[in-house]
A protein has these predicted regions:
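Conserved glycine-rich cofactor-binding loop
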Residues: 180
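Rossmann-fold cofactor-recognition segment
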Residues: 217-231
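Catalytic loop of short-chain dehydrogenase/reductase
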Residues: 265-266, 282-283, 320-351, 356-357, ...
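Conserved NAD(P)H cofactor-binding loop of Rossmann-fold oxidoreductase domains
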Residues: 252-259
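Substrate-binding pocket helix/loop in short-chain dehydrogenase/reductase
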Residues: 260-272, 278-289
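C-terminal helical subdomain
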Residues: 372, 380, 384-425
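A short, exposed helix-loop element centered on a Lys and neighboring polar residues
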Residues: 303-304, 357
Length: 437
């Protein structure tokens, strides 16, 4: 078992040394091979299995290698097998691997049948050895295979090769956009426990202190800063101050009101007059607008102001915990299919999901991973009318930090989120009808 190392501050770059450009591993994949990436994005190892003859397929293909059937659904695999050969690449024609040489790779014969090529930990066991193959996302966001020793725990962040496939917060500088919520405060504590080097915590009005903010501010390596995602000037101020230092951004800011369409008396912008049913009433801002202003436009403001700085710094050094690696969006399982009792909140999160997919596409060439978190109902005042099970703030924070360590792209914490995801995959239209019943 590798012993976790203490978080260390990255060395200051010398001005006379070359600045590394963002380099990625080979990106091209066939459409069939993207199935491996889709599973790896969820932290799962899947291979194609023929529905007619049962043969497990590798590499991914359009027709069965044994019976030529085209019915090849992706199926979860245990990944157990035997490392039968290994080698170390000292010189590669690919610029990414040339910078990171030497690089260990090996040949694994799975118990399920196929023989495949996998990355090996730099300090892993030599062949022959029992291993467990897992699917991970590489720096380019594509699925790759890694063979871990069966009876040894490898800390990915402490391994020179596997560090490229994780977004572990150890030694990193993290921005949590909203520290006034229970989720934000739980995240700050877990990030510090995971070894984060610095945590900036956003808060709203200085005169309105929420419970827990004082305790959070007193923690070591924590700095509070004013951040209002509805105010472009506030976001620009934060971007100008720390945007060039953020390694991981976790957007926890959200507005949630349990309303459908008919429950709103208007959709006026801030300070306007909302008219409904022949009556008018002054409103500072209505609930639906507030949800969109934070959940969607707040994310857009962050992406436009801090995103470019993270992309430009993402190259870092090939050998160390430096440079931006991840952007985390706290969404909702309601983003997949609208939940009418929380209809406008669902719509705002669906808009944020679509925007985050655009952000992911723009961040991917720089190697910054965009992670979307889809929790079920959270145990707070805005979901108190919903029956259990609900997700606690600590459980959600643990899922976020776990997603960073595992390097996945999408995570669905909680029983409700897992059940809705399964039903949505089976038939989105049926789920829509079930939720509206």
């Amino acid at each position: 078992m590798t012993s976790p190392k203490r978080p260390t501050r990255p060395k200051r770059k010398q001005a006379m040394l070359i600045t590394h450009l963002p380099r990625l591993p080979p990106v091209m994949r066939s459409r069939a091979a993207l199935g491996l990436t889709a599973a790896a994005a969820l932290g799962r190892f899947q291979l194609q299995v023929c529905s007619d003859c049962g043969a497990v397929q590798y590499p991914p293909r359009e027709s069965c290698r044994r019976c030529l059937s085209d019915r090849l659904p992706w199926t979860d695999q245990s990944g157990t097998g035997e490392l039968i050969a290994e080698t170390t690449v000292h010189l590669s024609q690919d610029a990414y691997f040339r910078e990171r040489a030497p690089w260990r790779v090996g040949m694994v014969r799975l118990d399920a049948g196929p023989t495949l090529i996998a990355h090996l930990p730099a300090a892993g066991a030599a062949a022959p050895a029992r291993v467990r193959v897992a699917a991970k996302l590489d720096k380019s966001g594509q699925g790759v295979l890694v063979a871990f020793p069966s009876h040894e725990v490898i800390t990915m962040t402490d391994d020179r090769q596997l560090r490229e496939m994780t977004c572990d917060p150890k030694g990193r500088k993290v921005l949590v956009t909203d520290g006034e919520t229970a989720v934000g405060q739980a995240l700050v504590r877990l990030l510090l426990a995971a070894g984060a080097g610095q945590v900036w915590v956003g808060h709203g009005k200085s005169w309105k202190k929420s419970p827990g903010c004082v305790e959070i501010a007193a923690l070591p390596r924590v700095a509070m800063l004013p951040l209002d995602l509805t105010d472009s000037k506030s976001v620009k101020s934060v971007a100008g101050g720390i945007g060039g230092q953020v390694d991981i951004l976790i957007n926890t800011a959200e507005v949630h009101r349990p309303h459908g369409v008919a429950a709103h008396s208007g959709t006026s912008a801030r300070g306007g007059i909302a008219t409904h049913g022949g009556t008018s009433a002054r409103r500072g801002i209505d609930d639906a607008w507030a949800e969109m202003d934070i959940n969607y436009f707040g994310l857009l403001r962050l992406a436009q102001e801090i995103g470019p700085a993270m992309k430009s710094r993402a190259a870092g050094a090939p050998d160390g915990p430096t440079g931006p690696i991840a952007w985390v969006n706290l969404l909702s399982i309601y983003a997949l299919s609208n939940f009418p009792p929380h209809g406008t909140f669902s719509a705002s999160k669906a808009a944020a999901l679509s925007l985050s997919q655009c952000l992911r596409a723009e961040m991917r060439p720089s190697g910054v991973r965009v992670i979307n978190v889809f929790p079920g109902p959270i145990d707070d005042e805005w979901s108190e009318a919903l029956p259990p099970p609900k997700l606690t703030a600590d459980a959600l924070a643990k899922a976020v930090v776990g997603a960073l360590k595992d390097g996945v792209e999408d995570v669905y914490p909680g029983d409700v989120a897992q059940e809705w995801l399964l039903r949505w995959r089976e038939n989105p239209k049926i789920l829509e009808r079930e939720l509206s019943a």
